[in-house]
């Protein structure tokens, strides 16, 4: 069985993340969405909220394939989380050349530390290429319409966060 790990902060999960997740499911039997926990960062959504939003969004978009997705937390190196969960592939989404430059550096470092783990780059669909979680949070905080950029449940959760 092929297991892929897809790591990020997912604060919040966006349509771009879901696009990468769909691509990962075409490559692997099981995809682990690994939410990085950084003690120095204060995310908008708690870990439990992010797990719930990823799971609800996956079910809404992926239907029966959502059963092939699990969500975990990790702190430290993603290669350690990948090893712990038996992943052979590390999936990374690419929006543009800037992402590619950064991800190539990371793939090189990860490849040196974990040669058994293959990094796979998935180019973003043009329809979601401009979406970032940071921009989504900024737009939502200013009362803008974020529905084109995030799953329905995420839009509702963001609207609730910024109305309170």
From Swiss-Prot:
Gene Ontology terms: biological process: coenzyme A biosynthetic process
Family: Belongs to the bacterial CoaD family.
Gene3D superfamilies assigned: HUPs (3.40.50.620)
Essential cofactor(s): Mg(2+)
Top EC class, one word: transferase
EC number, as in UniProt: 2.7.7.3
GO CC terms: cytoplasm
One matching Pfam family: CTP_transf_like
Protein name, UniProt field: Phosphopantetheine adenylyltransferase
Site (Transition state stabilizer): 17
Pathways per UniProt: Cofactor biosynthesis; coenzyme A biosynthesis; CoA from (R)-pantothenate: step 4/5
Sequence positions that bind ATP: 9-10, 17, 93-95, 103, 128-134
Function of the molecule: Reversibly transfers an adenylyl group from ATP to 4'-phosphopantetheine, yielding dephospho-CoA (dPCoA) and pyrophosphate.
Organism: Brucella canis (strain ATCC 23365 / NCTC 10854 / RM-666)
Catalytic activity: (R)-4'-phosphopantetheine + ATP + H(+) = 3'-dephospho-CoA + diphosphate
Keywords annotated in UniProt: ATP-binding, Coenzyme A biosynthesis, Cytoplasm, Magnesium, Nucleotide-binding, Nucleotidyltransferase, Transferase
InterPro entries tied to this protein: Cyt_trans-like, PPAT, Rossmann-like_a/b/a_fold
Complexes and interactors: Homohexamer.
GO molecular function: ATP binding; pantetheine-phosphate adenylyltransferase activity
Annotated residues for binding of substrate: 9, 41, 78, 92
SUPFAM superfamilies named in the record: Nucleotidylyl transferase
Cellular location(s): Cytoplasm
């Amino acid at each position: 069985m092929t297991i892929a790990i897809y790591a990020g902060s997912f604060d919040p999960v966006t349509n771009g993340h879901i696009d990468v997740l769909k691509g990962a499911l075409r490559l692997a039997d099981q995809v682990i969405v690994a939410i990085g926990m950084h003690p120095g960062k204060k995310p908008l959504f708690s870990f439990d909220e992010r797990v719930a939003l990823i799971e609800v969004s996956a079910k809404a978009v992926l239907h029966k394939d959502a059963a092939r997705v699990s969500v975990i937390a990790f702190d430290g190196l993603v290669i350690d989380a990948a090893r712990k969960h038996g992943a052979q592939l590390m999936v990374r989404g690419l929006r543009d050349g800037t992402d590619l430059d950064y991800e190539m550096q990371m793939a090189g470092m990860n490849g040196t530390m974990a040669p058994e783990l293959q990094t796979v780059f998935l180019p973003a669909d043009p329809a979601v290429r401009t979406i970032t979680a940071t921009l989504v949070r900024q737009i939502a905080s200013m009362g803008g319409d974020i529905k084109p950029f995030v799953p329905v449940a995420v839009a509702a959760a963001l609207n609730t966060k910024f109305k309170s």
